Amino acid sequence: MKAIKKSLTEEEYLYLDFSHQTEGCIFPLHTSVTLFLLSYCDCKIFKICLVVTKEVSRDSSLLRDDLIQDVEIQIISRQELPPIVQNCCLPAVVERSDNFCRAGLAVVLRHIIQKSYEADPLKKELLELLGFKKTCLKACAEVSQWTRLCELTIPLAIENFLRESSDQPPTIPVEILQLEKKLSEPVRVHNDDKLRRQKLKQQKADGVGPPLTKGKAKSKVHTQETSEGLDSSSKSLELKVAFSKLTVQEEPATTNREPSHIRKAKASDLPPLEHVFAEGLYFTLADIVLLPCIHHFLVIISRKFSEKLVEFPLLASWYQRIQEVPGVKTAASKCGIQFLHLPKLLTTSTEQHPNLCEVPGVEEQSDPLFIGGPRPTMAKLMEKGIEVMFSPHPCPTWTLDWNVLPAAVSPKEGKMSSDRALRKQQQLNNLVYVVTNQAKPGDRIVDFCSGGGHVGIVLAHMLPSCQVTLIENKELSLIRAKKRSDELGLSNIWFIQANMEYFTGMFNIGVALHACGVATDMVIEHCIKTRASFVTCPCCYGFIQNTSKFNFPKSEQFKKTLSYKEHMILCRFADQTAVQLPPQRRLIGKQCMCLVDLDRARAAEECGYSVQVISMEPESCSPKNNMIVGVPI
């Protein structure tokens, strides 16, 4: 491991899990996906370390045939990982300073794309993998269906399928059927109105039959790889647009206006756009993630249960089409993926699986439509003895002496207005007082959803004997925080770009200032699992909703009294606390905030915690000025 430490000053290290391999498939599939992306990007700027268990041989020659060709891979044990990586799920990337880590499949894959483009700016097609506004797989799995599908449900479902596959006809994973259904849904892109009108024009010119064939000659501008093997659908508008994007060649702008009957057509009369790739028209990171997973699934199906292929014809067509993307066959070959040639399937699976519209883990709410404001709901709670109630603030006048602290500690360094910086200081006074009174030397403190690091940097400076970890999904925010930390010379701080569920380390205190919506509930849950204290200031109550992990209300006491929709009424009005609103309306908003947070507090108490809901001082420090403080009993 000494060699690794020395090399970290020169390059980044990429750590990948390895448990076993079966029939050319590397487990976990996250590793297969990462290796495939490295091959597709022709990326050799990372030092790759395969992290194996004790039972796995450390002889890399045994793995050579199933890994990327011409890439050096080092085999290490989990005990040899840098300390920061030992606290994260793999894959993970560590920068040369050894205190900045990126963890989780989506975060790591996006980083690989960015670094590959920086190494060769001529490869503009790599940036196109990140999609419109570069947001592909950027949102966490808790709020993004595509991130959840690509990062969690599809890889896990196929891993389980591959483990359990036998000679008996298998049950097709519901996640596969959900993906099939998604491929049948109309495509939504930022300029879909324009494209749908172009498609209508094609259909009108062709007698509402097959699309125009004028694009056939134009398709020759694409690489030879794309021009071979496509069926007649290559003439469609969707495919022309998709493959022009792949070669970073926009369709030439037309100066002629569309005919009047096309311009005046109602949006409801326009034909829908059909999927070319997973998310819609364009080849993105989502396709990269899905390809190794779907390939290994189809290998088993086509070999043993080929009659099952009729259940997902759109997925099979996607699999065939993606092989024609420039560079995919080459990358797959380097990774040992030998593509299948599937029969053309004409049936659709939508009618065979009519119930796939339901999202697992999110129950359909059968409550009747709730009409009215929050008062009936609040009265209903009062009848059950549940009233707005705040615990007293432990020290409302306490404040840090910001004038004597180094400039980089102050939120003023976070590039905000003086008024906002003052309010941020007031918010920090509340959190820092509670945390510093709980913390002991040697404690590990985690600042979840840390943003620019305002909370974590102050705590690291004030508590030099504690280890502080900042966890944030937004890269630029975390980079700004690290810059401030470097100015202060802090040595007791880690930076982890990841969704919080990929942080697996033990800690003593969890902190979150204005974690949005259900992120507050995720922080509290994470702390409860670790039996850590928590200090959270919730935000964005209007975004609270049932997810695959959480159902609201959370506590048994509130569940017995309120329906989900009644709870949502409280959340909606809890967001109405802005200073420009009338005082009475803000008061009701504050009361709704308290009730929503009391539900969170009661749920934590049911898990063996002592919990207080406190109003921060001064109340003007933020419209969202509640603080939930929990300590394990």
From Swiss-Prot:
* Entry keyword Phosphoprotein: yes
Residue numbers carrying Phosphoserine: 233
Q: Which tissues and organs express this gene's product?
A: Widely expressed in cell types relevant to airway function, including airway smooth muscle cells and epithelial cells.
Where is there biased composition of kind Polar residues? 224-233
One Pfam family named in its UniProt record: Methyltransf_32
Q: Which UniProt keywords apply?
A: Cytoplasm, Phosphoprotein
What are the GST C-terminal domain coordinates in residue numbering?
A: 130-332
| Family to which this protein belongs | Belongs to the GSTCD family.
PANTHER family for the chain: GLUTATHIONE S-TRANSFERASE C-TERMINAL DOMAIN-CONTAINING PROTEIN (PTHR13369:SF0), PTHR13369
Q: What is this protein called?
A: Glutathione S-transferase C-terminal domain-containing protein
Q: Which organism is it from?
A: Homo sapiens (Human)
Gene name on record? GSTCD
